[in-house]
Amino acid sequence: MKLSRRSFMKANAVAAAAAAAGLSVPGVARAVVGQQEAIKWDKAPCRFCGTGCGVLVGTQQGRVVACQGDPDAPVNRGLNCIKGYFLPKIMYGKDRLTQPMLRMKDGKYHKDGEFTPVSWDQAFDVMEEKFKTSLKEKGPEAIGMFGSGQWTIWEGYAAAKLFKAGFRSNNIDPNARHCMASAVVGFMRTFGMDEPMGCYDDIEQADAFVLWGSNMAEMHPILWSRITNRRLSDPNVKVAVLSTFQHRSFELADNGIVFTPQSDLMILNYIANYIIQHDAVNQDFFTKHVNLRKGATDIGYGLRPTHPLEKAAKNPGSDASGPMSFDEYKAFVAEYTLDKTAAMTGVPKDQLEQLAQLYADPNKRVISYWTMGFNQHTRGVWANNLVYNLHLLTGKISQPGCGPFSLTGQPSACGTAREVGTFSHRLPADMVVTNEKHRDICEKHWQIPAGTIPAKVGLHAVAQDRALKDGKLNVYWVMCNNNMQAGPNINEDRMPGWRDPRNFIIVSDPYPTVSALSADLILPTAMWVEKEGAYGNAERRTQFWRQQIKAPGEAKSDLWQLVQFSRRFKTEEVWPEALLAQKPELRGKTLYDVLFATPAVSKFPLSELKEDQLNDESRELGFYLQKGLFEEYAWFGRGHGHDLAPFDDYHNARGLRWPVVDGKETQWRYSEGNDPYVKAGEGYKFYGKPDGKAVIFALPFEPAAESPDNEYDLWLSTGRVLEHWHTGSMTRRVPELHRAFPEAVVFIHPLDAKARDLRRGDKVKVSSRRGEVISFVETRGRNRPPQGLVYMPFFDAAQLVNNLTLDATDPLSKETDFKKCAVKLAKV
C-alpha cells in the first residue's frame, strides 16, 4: 500500500510524541500507517481537560483503533498531549462495565449485598421505588444528584431540567464545584457575567505571561507549547510562575516565585499598591469603566456551623460589599508594602518588584492564567477578584494579548456545568434559582406551571456529603465523576453517608471506580464517541461530535439514562395539586412527556440524521433528541450575550466561540470592534453589570483554615500529574500511561526527608487530623517542594489522598481547598 508523505509525517508525529515521553504506541501510529485506507475518520474534541483540543478519531469494525491531533483544529493545530494520543485505549479497559449491577442478598436488594448483574428494568424498578418513597416521605429535598463537567451539554441540560423542573429539587451540583466554582463567583462579582473575555489567540500576541497556581506544562500542555513557542521566539517576552512549590512550568520561567501557602492574596494587593504608587493606573479606562467596592471580611471557612472557626467568624458566608472612593482604596492597598509582603510570603523583594513591573508597564501586554491554585482556596473568589483588579487598574483587558484568563480543568466545565446551569444555585445563561424573574423565564420556556422550580438554593457538593451523613439526603445519583476518591475528607463526611442504610446511592460510570464500588447500584455508561456529544472549552468554544461506535454490552449514555428514567414518574407523583391546577392538561403525563417529548424538543425528525449515522438515543425515541435539547437550551442565551450558533453549524466547524452573532464568533468580549454587544463609541462595556462598569474589590489577606503546628508540621498540597487525569479512572487503564507513572508518591524536600530519616523510595505514612495514607517518598523529579510542604497527586485509588484533606471551602463559592491542610510523616 502506498503512503502519502503527509500521512507518513502524521504517523511519525504520533510516534515521536509518545517516544518523547518514553512510551510505545501500539495500535495508534501503526494503525494510521498500516490500516489507513480501512479506517473511517471523524472529528471530536478530546475527552480530557478543558483546553478543548481537536482530534481525529479512527474507527474500524466498531472500535476506535486510532487517534491523532486534528491539523484543522485551531486550539491544538494537530498536536496532542500524551493523554490525547492514547484516547482510544481509555474505552477498552479489561474491567469495563457492560450491565447494571445491584447489591443483592437472597434475590433482592440489600445494602450489604454483593454486586449482582440485573437488567435495566430491574435497576430502574429499584431506583423508582427509592425515589418515590423519599419524595413522598420527605419531599424533593431528600433526593439529589452529583454531576459533572464531563457531561455533554445536553446531558447536563437534561439532568438540570429533570431535577429542577421535574423533581422540583435544586439538590443537583457538578464536580466542577470542586474546581471552577470560585472562578464563576469571581467573574459574576466583578463583571456580572461568567467566563473569560479573551481567547487562546492572546498567546501569540502577549508580551508577558503570569501563572498563578497553574502548572500549565503538565495540566494544559498544548497551551503551554504555544506559550513556550512565543517565549522562545522573542527574547522580550517574559514568563512569571507563582506556586507554593516548584514544578515543570518553572523551567521556562524568567521569574519563578515560590510563596507561603495562602499568601498569594498579599502579593496581589502588593501589586495593586505598586501600580498606584508608580502612577501606572490607566486613568481614562479606570474613570470610564470601573467602580470600587469594599468587601465583607472574616467570612469563615465553609465548615459546619458548629465548627469553632465558623463560630468565631464575624461575617460567615457574607458576600456583602459597599462603595468606596479611590483614595480609600489607595489607603487600603498601601498597607501591602514591599517589606511586609516579602516578610509574609517568603518571596525575595526583587522578585516581587519584577512581577509588579510586568503589570505596571503600560507597553507590556500581560495575560494572567490560573487554575486550581487560585480556585481551590478558602479565599478563591477573592483571589479571582484581586487578579481582575490588576487588569482593571491598568486597562489590560479585553484586547488582543492581554487579560485575565481562568483555565478550566474539565472538557465541559464551562459548556455544561457553568453555561447550562447544573450548579445547585444556577439556571441556564447565568440565571439563578433565587431570582423570581429568572425562574419565570425558565418555567415559561419549558411550559411548566409557575412556581415549579424551587426558589431555595440546593445542596452544593460538600453540603450533599454532610446531608447524606445526617440522613437528610436519602437518594443520591452520581454521574460521570468519581467523587468518593476526588472529594475531600472521605472518612469523616462522605463514606459514612454513602454506606448509611437509610440512603440509596446510584453511580453511573464505565468502570468500577472507588465511587462505583461504594454505591448500591452501578449503571454502565457509554463513553466519549460511543454517543453524540458537545463540550464547551475554556475559551468559550462549543464543539460537537457524532456518535462513531456503539457502547459495549448494555452500557448506555447518561442522556439515555436520564430521559428513560423520567418515564417512570407521572406529574401527580412529583408535583403538588396547586401546580397541576394551573395546567390540568399535564395531569397523567410522565416527566418524559412534559420535559423531553415536548413539541419544542421533538420537532426535529430522524431524517436530519444521515442514513448510516449512529445515534442510539434518537433512533430509539424517534426524533433527533440532541438537536431538540440543544436548540431549546440555546434560546436562553441568544440576545443576552451568550449567543450560541444554530445546531448544524457546529457539526460543520471546529467549534465556535460565543457569543456567535450573525454567524460570527467573538474572540474578545466587552470591547468595541470585537464584541457585537459593545456599540460604536462605547470603547468598553461590561454589560453584565447594569451600569456597564466592572468592579474592583478591596479584599484583605486572611489565613488558611488549617496550618502546620508542632504535631502536624507540614503543609500538604494535592493535585495532578501529566500522565493521569483526575482520579485515573480512565488513564490508569491505559497500560502505557500507567507504566509511566504507576503509583502516587509524596514529593518532599530532601532536607525534610533527611530530618525524618526518610530516603527516596521509602514507604511512609502520611497522617492528618482526619485520616492517613501509605505512600512512597520522592525527593527528586518534576515537583520540588520547599521545606515545610509536601505534594501528592490524587490519581491513585490505592492511596486515597483525600482521606487527609479538610472539607473547608470558600464560603462564597463553596469550592473546596485541596491545596492547604496540615500533615505529618512517619517511616513505615
Curated annotation (Swiss-Prot):
Its cofactor is [4Fe-4S] cluster; Mo-bis(molybdopterin guanine dinucleotide). The keyword Oxidoreductase applies. One of its GO terms (molecular function) is electron transfer activity. InterPro entries: Asp_de-COase-like_dom_sf (IPR009010), CT_Nitrate-R-NapA-like (IPR041957), MoPterin_dinucl-bd_dom (IPR006657), Mopterin_OxRdtase (IPR006656), Mopterin_OxRdtase_4Fe-4S_dom (IPR006963), MopterinOxRdtase_cofactor_BS (IPR027467), Periplasm_NO3_reductase_lsu (IPR010051), Prok_molybdopt-oxidoreductase (IPR050123). GO terms for biological process: cellular respiration; Mo-molybdopterin cofactor biosynthetic process; nitrate assimilation. GO terms for cellular component: membrane; nitrate reductase complex; periplasmic space. [4Fe-4S] cluster binds at C46, C49, C53, C81. Binds 1 [4Fe-4S] cluster. Binds 1 molybdenum-bis(molybdopterin guanine dinucleotide) (Mo-bis-MGD) cofactor per subunit. Mo-bis(molybdopterin guanine dinucleotide) binds at residues 83, 150, 175, 179, 212-219, 243-247, 262-264, 372, 376, 482, 508-509, 531, 558, 718-727, 802, 819. Its main location: periplasm. NCBIfam families: NAPA (TIGR01706), PRK13532.1 (NF010055), TAT_signal_seq (TIGR01409). This is Periplasmic nitrate reductase.
